[in-house]
Amino acid sequence: MELSAFTTCRHELKRPLLIVSGSKGSLACGYLNVATFEKLGEAVAIVRGVNDFDEMCAASVQEISPAAERLGVRPGMTGEEALALMK
């Protein structure tokens, strides 16, 4: 997936902290907590066990916030599918 339409952030820790944000929501790694996004009314889909943005796009969404659910994001879809809904 071409990510030029998104904002990406990578922070090096023992495992990288990764987030890809579109205008409607974000795809994030497991370092981030859905509850925080939920509290703020933000759309997020969480994927786990990823080391780079390509792996994020291919990974299965594990958790979503209610705002992401309203956009049509569902657990089990790929990160790429989730990003298409949050672009």
Predicted regions and their residues:
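Residues that scaffold, gate, or flank divalent-cation-dependent active/transport sites
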Residues: 1-87
